[in-house]
Design a protein with these regions (language model features):
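N-terminal presequence-like segments and the immediate start of the first folded domain
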Residues: 4-79, 83-96, 102-163
């Protein structure tokens, strides 16, 4: 009986790890959508939904001032999202959508280039990029909020959508 219980526990652990390895299904976009580093749709079925609060960054992990430093703020925001998702049992690639607010439209293309670095497999979250006139905190150049789904049963290898 003890061997059966142990085997059941081991199989349960394996199934749990396998579920964590699954990801959402990212529908392939048009050439224009790919060039802007976002997916037109992301399909999930099951998994744990993590709602990421709007994140901004006026200092990096070493305490260096990032006020007005667009690229530094982008890097720090993605670092913070990665840490938060790890605490929730996920990873940055579990993000399925993000809303990006910038206060200078000239930074839009640079953000798209930088986002590619964080999703190198090309499975980009759905996204909106919105220009705002100002933020509540001086020095902020960008704020991002997002949603992640951890351990979803859909994936590009095993799609849930009819193709």
């Amino acid at each position: 009986m003890r061997i059966g219980s142990r085997l059941f526990c081991v199989l349960g652990l394996i199934a749990g790890f396998a579920a964590q390895a699954l990801s959402a299904e990212y529908l392939e976009g048009s050439a224009r959508q790919k060039s802007r580093a976002y997916s037109p749709a992301v399909i999930t079925e099951g998994g744990r939904t993590v709602w990421l609060a709007g994140q901004l960054a006026l200092a990096d992990a070493e305490g260096r001032n990032l006020a007005g430093n667009f690229e530094g703020q982008v890097r720090e925001i993605f670092r913070q999202f990665d840490l938060t998702l790890k605490r929730a049992g996920g990873k940055l690639s579990d993000m399925v959508t993000m809303t990006v607010f910038i206060n200078d439209p000239r930074n839009g293309d640079r953000f798209v280039e930088m986002r590619r670095d964080y999703f190198p497999d090309g499975h980009y979250p759905g996204s909106a990029l919105i220009t705002v006139s100002n933020f509540a905190v001086p020095g902020v150049a960008i704020e991002i909020q997002g949603v992640a789904v951890i351990g979803d049963k859909c994936s590009n290898a095993s799609p849930c959508s009819p193709r």
